[in-house]
């Protein structure tokens, strides 16, 4: 068997061009591996055939939709993970799964080298190569887009010169990454921060400012932090995401226009659509507010930010991230119950919570007669709680 390069293949411009380029420059055969992560309406058989048309000797499609939902999206839900408090890690959580399957394909197809189509400006180069280093440090890595400073214009020209089938032109230069968890759009006129996104940027969501539909009220049920039913109908994690993508997307929920801090030190503008992700994270977070003890909840919120940063920075397999996984999993033991919410006009409005694990005690919380909270405890508590501040104030004020 000839020496082979196993390429992470998306079906897009950069990786389609990379197949032909790698063959010409290295003389090695290219095996294209495309991972089905629920990429919207994209036909994976078309993607597989496109790789062969571009010159791959083999083209493999891996159906990883349930694996992605159960092992990557679910931990993101349970971590309430929003990088910079906004981005639900649409692309970031898919990269370690792609790395895993690329390594498996390299072992199965005689690959000694793995390749990706990432640029030198983005985060994905780090996510891929740190992942390869964690799972298969013996494999070589090549990154033609980065290492040879391809521009989109050069890539398009190369594709046209070599008759490579692509779905992009200089007039429509968006770079799009999508999976069942969400959709990311960048480049083109979006690079000017003052330019508003046009309607052709969006695909997963309807415009929340026009043609409003009737509000959609629904109930999401969780068991140990895992979504298990919608409106009483049992669902897998994948089915929950898909159903909420449909219903929330129809209400314009999940549109995000973000300027984010990339790992490589630059700021980047991204347009995200993540209707199902945003609904599930919001609902899960609300249920935690009901079921988690205060100090546990406070500490978990600190770990959520760090977990999000680690995943964004490509450290999915790092010891710290793995340790935080264990902590977060422990916190989910009593996160069970129902969250009722309304989707309308791009908004997520929680209006009901119930749980057998609830720490909300009506008799303690009520201000009506018959409450069981003994207010005689309050005066001494306030004095003790503020004592150190009071002592410091006397010193600072010279009293």
From Swiss-Prot:
Pathway assigned in UniProt: Amino-acid biosynthesis; L-arginine biosynthesis; L-arginine from L-ornithine and carbamoyl phosphate: step 2/3
Documented EC number(s): 6.3.4.5
Pfam families: Arginosuc_syn_C, Arginosuc_synth
Keyword flag Ligase: yes
Domain of life: Bacteria
Residues the entry annotates as binding L-citrulline: 87, 123, 127, 175, 260, 272
Binding residue positions for ATP: 8-16, 117
Chief location of this protein within or outside the cell: cytoplasm
Annotated GO MF terms: argininosuccinate synthase activity; ATP binding
UniProt-listed Gene3D superfamilies: Argininosuccinate synthetase, chain A, domain 2, HUPs, Single helix bin
Keywords: Amino-acid biosynthesis, Arginine biosynthesis, ATP-binding, Cytoplasm, Ligase, Nucleotide-binding
Cross-referenced CDD domains: ASS
Record flagged with keyword Acyltransferase: no
The reaction(s) this protein catalyses: L-citrulline + L-aspartate + ATP = 2-(N(omega)-L-arginino)succinate + AMP + diphosphate + H(+)
PROSITE patterns reported in the protein's UniProt record: ARGININOSUCCIN_SYN_1, ARGININOSUCCIN_SYN_2
Family statement: Belongs to the argininosuccinate synthase family. Type 1 subfamily.
Subunit and interaction comment: Homotetramer.
Annotated protein name in UniProt: Argininosuccinate synthase
Source organism: Rhodococcus opacus (strain B4)
Taxonomic lineage of the native organism: Bacteria, Bacillati, Actinomycetota, Actinomycetes, Mycobacteriales
